[in-house]
């Protein structure tokens, strides 16, 4: 795979990429079947120990159909640092990743994944988990796990070149 052309913008450290994955409010995940691309935006939780991303979803639908046929995905987590007014530049930090999606069946793994997502997204995760996570909710919800195989990062924290 071709590397980043602007080396000064490359994120080299794994921990910095993980930080972006955990700080981002959502991810975009691209998938493809029969040469037709499909892109979705997802709430997520990143599990550092397993180097994976969890997302929740319905148990049926277009995304599920595509992923059952081709479970390889490309995704992005983006931290938008804003447009640099008058400089024709945008400040950001982003991580792109490739991985494979597995839909979880084991209730214990699904519950753990839900807790990872709740801790990533909620201000009061313990309260929300106690109210929302039950054997019934775990059974009802679909949970996907993206096992990350490759990550790359890029950032623009200051205007380097103005038009």
Residue ranges and their predicted role:
Residues 9, 18, 53, 62-65, ...:
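Anion-coordinating catalytic cores for phosphoryl-, nucleotidyl-, and glycosidic chemistry
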Residues 28, 54, 74, 98, ...:
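Beta-strand secondary-structure signal
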Residues 20-21, 66-67, 117:
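A generic structural signal for nonpolar/aromatic side chains embedded in well-ordered alpha-helices
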Residues 1-22:
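Extreme N-terminal tail/first-helix region
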Residues 23-59, 75:
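Short beta-strand segments
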């Amino acid at each position: 795979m071709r590397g980043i052309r602007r080396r000064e913008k490359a994120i080299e450290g794994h921990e910095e990429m993980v930080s972006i994955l955990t700080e981002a409010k959502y991810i975009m995940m691209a998938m493809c079947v029969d040469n037709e691309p499909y892109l979705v935006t997802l709430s997520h939780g990143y599990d550092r120990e397993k180097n994976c991303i969890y997302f929740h979803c319905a148990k049926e639908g277009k995304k599920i159909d595509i992923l059952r046929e081709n479970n390889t995905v490309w995704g992005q987590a983006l931290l938008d640092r804003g447009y640099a007014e008058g400089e024709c530049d945008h400040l950001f930090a982003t991580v792109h990743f490739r991985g494979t999606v597995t839909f979880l069946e084991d209730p214990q793994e699904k519950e753990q994944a839900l807790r990872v997502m709740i801790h990533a997204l909620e201000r009061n995760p313990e309260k929300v988990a106690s109210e929302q996570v039950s054997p019934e909710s775990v059974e009802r919800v679909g949970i996907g796990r993206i096992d990350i195989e490759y990550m790359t990062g890029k950032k623009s924290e200051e205007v380097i070149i103005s038009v």
